[in-house]
Amino acid sequence: VAELAAFAKERGILFHTDAVQAAGHIPIDVRSLPVDALSLSGHKLYGPKGIGVLYLRRGTAIAPLIEGGAQERELRAGTENVPGIVGLGCAAELAAAELPEEMRRLAGLRDALMDGLLTIDGAWINGSRTQRLPGNLSFGIAGLDAESLLIRLDLAGFAVSAGSACSAGSLEPSQVLTAMGQPPAQAGSAIRVTLGRFTTADETAAFLAAVRSIAGTRKDK
């Protein structure tokens, strides 16, 4: 992101980054990150739903979202969600205080889960093993499409995803994975797993066992 932002800045291009998935999970420092704007969402770091943040670097001008009042520096009229703002602030403080330890814990669970998944015949990991969020992984298994694996894991009690909430309902393979060079068949088989603050080693072991059991039912294995 820093390299892209610097590239844009050299050319006079305004640069915004969506940090919704990053906030509370990896360090974010807008003093060293050369972005003009950054957004995040409270519920992604265990704060209240319905509250978020838009950071604008000093001197960055944008048009008002809602006119008619002076709230939020005249960018969005209407009474502010004060309880939500306070809740988000508390969540951010807690996340920052626990961040180094939680990053290590989640990365350990993630790496163990990736290693286990790769022992399943036909399994692969999408993306880098290390250049990713500590609690994030994306995988696929040959002979299992994402939808069927998603349903069977749901029946087994595991909530995973075949894409982002922004692409919910789309039957097309992930644009991100295809942009990364994944063939359509592999991109269409991808399952995203997110580990969180309350995820335990026992739960990741149970998830791995469920995936292994489902993979064992493939007709073409």
Predicted regions and their residues:
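Pyridoxal 5′-phosphate
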Residues: 1-221
